[in-house]
Amino acid sequence: MMDLFKAIGLGLVVLLPLANPLTTVALFLGLAGNMNSAERNRQSLMASVYVFAIMMVAYYAGQLVMNTFGISIPGLRIAGGLIVAFIGFRMLFPQQKAHESPEAKSKSEELEDEPSANIAFVPLAMPSTAGPGTIAMIISSASTVRHGVDFPGWVILVAPPLIFLAVSVILWGSLRSSGAIMRLVGKGGIEAISRLMGFLLVCMGVQFIINGVLEIIKTYH
């Protein structure tokens, strides 16, 4: 049993800095300003479920999917970096106020007409939480841990779903507490957080691209 707890602890130490639920909370605050409490809670739960599903698929089928479509981890990093940087630029340099933008109006109408429409999958679950770095780490870990001898076989079988569940629960708790943060910071604070998050996302996206390019150079040099 101690081996299981040790494996879960190691997994959380590796994944939490990459997933960074607090970053997702700040992004959520910038995107959910027009949502009521019930809708924010629903988005929080759905984002957590999506994160769990993405991590499970990445661990058990990620390498197969990437091999099937000929996708390399450097390619995954560069594509994810472009997406993150694009989202960051849109948040950092909004052409108009967020609540007056066509995207916001379209999303509001979509949420009214179609309850299943949401921001939980993109960008909260992917790429903010289960982004290219997280997915790449999970896929690379899956290809090595199954051949490792540090833990018993049953621990290697049981630990990954529990680690992903723990990350999802932490994300859900963080997003649920964002309501209190919204009451404290107000609309102006949300705008400031949104712009700050935009800058951070641009930096993250550029770094993902740099890492991908460096891996390509290292591979083919």
From Swiss-Prot:
Mode of membrane association: Multi-pass membrane protein
Annotated TM spans: 8-28, 45-65, 69-89, 119-139, 151-171, 197-217
Record's GO cellular component terms: plasma membrane
Record topological domains on the Periplasmic side: 1-7, 66-68, 140-150, 218-221
Regions of this protein lying in the Cytoplasmic compartment: 29-44, 90-118, 172-196
Keyword Membrane attributed: yes
InterPro entries membership: Multi_antbiot-R_MarC
Sorted UniProt keywords: Cell inner membrane, Cell membrane, Membrane, Transmembrane, Transmembrane helix
Family: Belongs to the UPF0056 (MarC) family.
Protein name: UPF0056 inner membrane protein MarC
Organism: Citrobacter koseri (strain ATCC BAA-895 / CDC 4225-83 / SGSC4696)
